[in-house]
Design a protein with these regions (language model features):
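Conserved N-terminal alpha-helix of the aminotransferase class I/II PLP-enzyme fold
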Residues: 13-61, 83-88, 94
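Conserved core of the PLP fold type I
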Residues: 54-73, 103-110
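Conserved PLP-anchoring active-site segment centered on the Schiff-base-forming lysine
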Residues: 71-89, 118
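Conserved C-terminal alpha-helix-loop-beta "cap" of PLP-dependent enzymes
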Residues: 74-76, 267, 272-340
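PLP-dependent aminotransferase-class I/II
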Residues: 99-137, 141-144, 151-158
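Active-site C-terminal subdomain of aminotransferase-like
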Residues: 108, 135, 142, 150, ...
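Catalytic PLP-binding core of fold-type I/II PLP enzymes
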Residues: 151-183
Length: 340
């Protein structure tokens, strides 16, 4: 069986496992107060060009999204997000569970536009009864998006400008950030993201770590943020496990280097799909590739390949997703191409 169902099929990069083994018997303080967490935080600040950033390590993406959004918003506020965004569709109502509504915006290939934020906010405040409604309190985007697409630097700057105008904190979900940063089609750097956002996170779970996400508040974290992390069940007692992983990922540019494999394998698959005449659902420059398959072909392929159902295309076709990762082997791509 070939596995292309997600980008976390593998365990962790061998360098991380080796470092965890080497440090296993060290006696260290808990909850992210150890020397490895401190070292990882400094390396992340340096990589972001943001020396005063507040950095925290959380265990997973959904906990991270819910904790950040819940910590930033007032009780009467909601978060603006693409109607196709992860927090809108694939987190089992985790944001609503914190007491905050997801306020959806129209999306084009997974991306929202600055104009959509402006339209929403001005329409909201133009309604004389807005005190009876959920206030827009922050903006959520992801990079790459749920569809593997990327914001350009110009688009990111425009969204940032609108967010500042209306005093809406901008939160960027970076679960797959490594893959976005190394795409040959991007002009966005980690420093650009730190400059344009109020908070973002660097994904580890999908980019080489066993688990974990590094949250970066570019200015200042909400007061008592760590306590709120604890309330959300996202604080790891053995915080060293996250610190060691991110310290390793941000040593010798490992995070960037291993991310390139996902792009190289995905682009080879993309070229093969195009050469074989398959219809791409959209043009993704990252590790997620979406293709329209005849239902008969989907059933046939599913006997030997694990892939992700995305959506119904029509009565005879389905959109599926192939996802590559830092650990995808080129020979598995070749085997998949043969089956196609």
């Amino acid at each position: 069986m070939l596995f292309f169902v997600n980008d976390y099929c593998e365990g962790a990069h061998p360098a991380i496992l080796q470092k965890l083994l080497e440090t296993n018997m060290e006696k260290l303080s808990g909850y992210g107060t150890d020397k490895y967490c401190d070292s990882a935080k400094e390396k992340i600040r340096k990589a972001c060009g943001c020396p005063d950033a507040d950095v925290f390590f959380l265990v997973g993406g959904t906990q991270t999204n819910a904790t950040i959004i819940g910590s930033v918003l007032n009780r009467y506020e909601g978060v603006l997000a693409a109607q196709t965004g992860h927090v809108s569709c694939h987190e089992a109502g985790a944001i609503e569970y914190t007491g905050h509504k997801v306020l959806t915006l129209p999306a084009e290939n997974g991306k929202i536009k600055a104009e959509s934020i402006t339209d929403y906010v001005e329409t909201f405040y133009g309604d004389e009864s807005h005190d009876h409604m959920v206030f827009p309190g922050m903006v959520y985007i992801s990079h790459p998006t749920e569809y593997g697409t990327l914001y350009t630097k110009k688009e990111l700057e425009e969204i940032s400008e609108v967010c500042h105008k209306y005093e809406l904190p901008l939160f960027l979900d970076g679960a797959r950030l490594g893959y976005g940063l190394v795409s040959p089609e991007t002009d966005v750097t980690l420093e650009d993201i730190a400059r344009c956002t109020d908070v973002f996170y660097i994904g580890g779970t999908k980019v080489g770590a066993l688990c974990g996400e590094a949250v970066v508040f570019t200015k200042k974290a909400p007061k008592h943020f760590m306590t709120m992390v604890k309330q959300q069940g996202a604080l790891l007692a053995k915080g060293r496990l996250l610190g060691i992983q991110f310290d390793t990922l941000f040593t010798d540019d490992l995070y960037t280097r291993i991310s390139k494999n996902a792009i190289e394998t995905a682009m080879k698959l993309k070229r093969a799909l195009q050469e074989k005449g398959y219809q791409l659902f959209l043009d993704s420059p990252t590790n997620q590739q979406f293709v329209v398959l005849e239902n008969k072909k989907k059933e046939e392929l599913g006997k030997e390949v694990q892939f992700d159902f995305w959506e119904k295309y029509d009565e005879d076709h389905t959109v599926i997703r192939f996802a590559t990762s830092w650990g995808t082997k080129m020979e598995d791509i070749d085997a998949l191409i043969e089956l196609l």
